[in-house]
Amino acid sequence: MSVRLAISDMIMKNAADWQKPFARRRGMGAISRREWLKGAAAAWAIAQGSSVAWGAELPHARPAKPDRHFTNPAVEALIPRVQRGIGDPALQTIFENCFPNTLDTTVYPGSFAGRPDTYVVTGDIDAMWLRDSSAQVWPYLSLAKDDPQLRALLEGVIRRQARMILLDPYANAFMRDEKAAPLSWAVHDKTEHHSGVGERKWEIDSLCYPIRLAHGYWRATGDTQPFDAQWKEAAWTIVRTFRVQQRKQGQGPYSFQRESAVPSDTVPLSGFGNPALPVGMIFSMFRPSDDACIFPLFVPANLFAVVSLRQLAALATHAISDAKLASEAESLAVEVERALERHGKTQHPKFGQIWAYEVDGYGNALMMDDANAPGLVSMAYL
């Protein structure tokens, strides 16, 4: 599933660099930013099932006010303030359409056991991904401290994520109804099924993103209400799952197979993945793109795990006063970090030692990157 944060900003920052090699290869002048935006707008409109004439202004594409899932005054007030600082009308419209989109179309606020509960549909599929939901609400953290309504929405995401992790720490996606059957394409997967799980692809980042969101929420608001006994148990579950997937004591309980014509949609060798040495890194069967790993020691997700575990240690120390959890999280972070330094790099013929994308601990390395986060390029963001 796609992480759709700051996409337009990243595109614009790199657009000029993308144009140069394209122009050289094609023997043509670089297109203007305006022309590039219009082309992007046309592609966006096609994807949305609407049409935009070449040369037309970008459409104002927010749902009508009665159809918006969640409206927040602080968010609405921020939009025109930011627009006034943007000189390009097309970028103004992109921001107006994109910044509130999560609130307009994907959140379902409610309550569970008397506490805030927020279901966040990933957008194109009626299921909640741990990764996507964390990323979708991230842009609103800076507004939450002084806004109880927005704070409750975010608390609801954190609480629901904790329940999801306790339901199955190896799952990447969950259904709205915790008793529901899986997503249609996952019904016949050969793995341990649990009610309420949409899909069970083991990805390290699925357990990193909820920590990132919880830590970001705490830093932004100072609020510790979401971090109750249930959240603490979910945090311990994350640490234990990472430990098991270091595979020092065997392969662990997780395996996954799917009958598919697409090799990247299933896991080889009886669902436990290609061979790799237990060097201290955490094994992952899938990438954040939901494609299977070739080598199970997935470097970007392990780098992300080091950061997330240290964020968890900070939360355990300052938000919930659990010294043992803080110690366990920091100890694991140190161990994974050392293993990455020793095994996560490879030698490039021109640039010397660089991070690999995936390794197996035997000396084999995959040299590539993935458009999703975590990837090597996105490490600075995470």
Protein language model regions, located:
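N-terminal secretory signal peptides
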Residues: M1-S32, A42-Q48
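Active-site-adjacent bridging/hinge elements
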Residues: L103-P116, A180-D189, P275-R287
